[in-house]
């Protein structure tokens, strides 16, 4: 059992916070998933980062790059500004946050409004660096069973 403080910034112990998501318990909402992903970067849990990215995007992820960035950075903190559902659809959400880290080039911060989708009881991060190859009439990449235009197209600005 770990007694370390969770890196996500809540002040809770890792095992009582993001640690149980890393162990397989689904995150209950988009903000919890985002916090657990930040903690996964701090802890070098690349498999977790891949597994919590939209399944349609997972083959396009740069696992080696993720691992290198995680290992070569000293993570300085996370601030969550907001978490909101999109258009009243509880399975679509945005989380706005700022992450700070230090590497050989100095101190950095990154502010992002990340998109998340829930499918089959699990939340997934939609990675803006990996293309979603879906036409408007194609099945939605989130696996909802709906056409892209009726599901995530408006949410993702497509």
Swiss-Prot record:
PANTHER family: ADENYLATE CYCLASE-ASSOCIATED CAP C-TERMINAL DOMAIN-CONTAINING PROTEIN, UPF0225 PROTEIN SCO1677
Similarity field: Belongs to the UPF0225 family.
Protein name, UniProt field: UPF0225 protein PSEEN1229
Lineage start: Bacteria, Pseudomonadati, Pseudomonadota, Gammaproteobacteria, Pseudomonadales
């Amino acid at each position: 059992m770990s007694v370390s403080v969770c890196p996500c910034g809540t002040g809770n112990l890792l095992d009582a916070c993001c640690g149980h998501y890393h162990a397989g318990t689904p995150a209950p909402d988009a903000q919890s998933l985002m916090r657990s992903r930040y903690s996964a970067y701090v802890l070098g849990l690349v498999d977790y980062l891949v597994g919590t990215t939209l399944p349609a995007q997972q083959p396009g992820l740069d696992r080696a790059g993720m691992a290198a960035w995680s290992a070569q950075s000293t993570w300085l903190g996370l601030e969550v500004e907001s978490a909101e559902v999109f258009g009243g659809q509880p399975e679509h959400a945005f989380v706005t946050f700022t992450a700070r880290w230090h590497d050989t080039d100095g101190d950095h911060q990154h502010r992002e409004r990340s998109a998340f989708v829930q499918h089959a009881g699990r939340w997934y991060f939609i990675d803006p660096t990996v293309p979603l190859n879906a036409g408007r009439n194609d099945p939605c990449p989130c696996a909802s069973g709906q056409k892209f235009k009726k599901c995530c197209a408006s949410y993702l600005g497509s």
